[in-house]
Every structure is written in structure tokens, then in C-alpha cells.
Amino acid sequence: MTLDAPVSGGTGGAEAATLTFMVGGSRQAFTVGEPILLAMGKRAVHCGTDGAGQAAKICNNMMLGISMIGACEAFVLAERLGLSHQALYDVASTSSGQCWALTTNCPVPGPVPTSPANRNYRPGFAAGLMLKDLKLAQEAALSNRAATPLGAEAAQIYGLFEAAGHRGEDFSAVINFLRGKDSTPA
């Protein structure tokens, strides 16, 4: 019996044993493996047959990459409009702009103390790993004839960010690329 079981939750989730496992494999294999997975995380979701865990992972991370770029673009625009980071966070985190990329991994220092932005973008989830997952999602979309124009754009943006030398930074550091800066602020 085998399972594919990629995770969501990053290094913080691994350290705190709060990972979510996206599991592919037979129901029988999942039933056997679930207690082992739950010893390392808080949730194991049976996504379907072999490969379904990986499919869920790339779909989830495509959504995450797109939403992080959206959050970053909103903060860059807010800066140009004279709106403080905290003001935008206070509005968006309690209204229709709310998303994990904002409330957990906020791309600007200040509003979320545990965000990588407060650690000079030391990664919880490195930009290079985001790009890898976005490329996998684009390969899957192409081979399955699924239209993912925003996923393709996100992959292109993260590809340019990586080419500029930022592979090892947290994926939220893409805000500096969108600001037109080639490196993170000091």
C-alpha cells in the first residue's frame, strides 16, 4: 500500500505539528496511514486515488500564489495612495479581501507579527518552492486542457522573481519585485 501525502503548513506547521496532509491512495491505505500522519499534523484529507494528494497540493498552491500576488499588489497600490499598511490590513482582514496570504503571511512588516516580512523575508515557504508548484500546476493544466491564465501569470512573476536572485526568500517577498525593487529592504 502506498500514499502520496504532500503537506500544507510550512516550516511553522511542521514545528508545531499543525500540518494538513493532502492524501492520495486507496481508502484502505489511507485508513492505515492516517494515524501516522496525524501524529505529525492536525488534519489528513483523503483526496482520492494515487496522485490525488499531489493534485490537491498544486491546485492549493496555485490559489496561494495568485492570492499572495493579489495581496502584494494591493499593498503596493495602498502605499502609492498614501494608505498605511495597518489601515489596509484592518480593512481587508475583516472584509471581502480576507485571505490566508493576508492574515497569516502578510507581505508587509507590522500587521502580522509572525509573518516572514517581519524577519526580512526569511522563508516559511520559499519563493523557489512556490515557483516549482506553479510550474507543476501549469504542466497539469496544459496536459488536461484546463485554462489557468492567472496561474500562468503567477508562474511568470515568480519565475522573474527567482531569476532576479530571490529563490530562497519567502514567497511573500515578491512584493519587493512588484514595487520595482530588486532586493528586500534593509
Show the residue positions of the predicted features.
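Hydrophobic alpha-helical segments
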Residues: 182-186
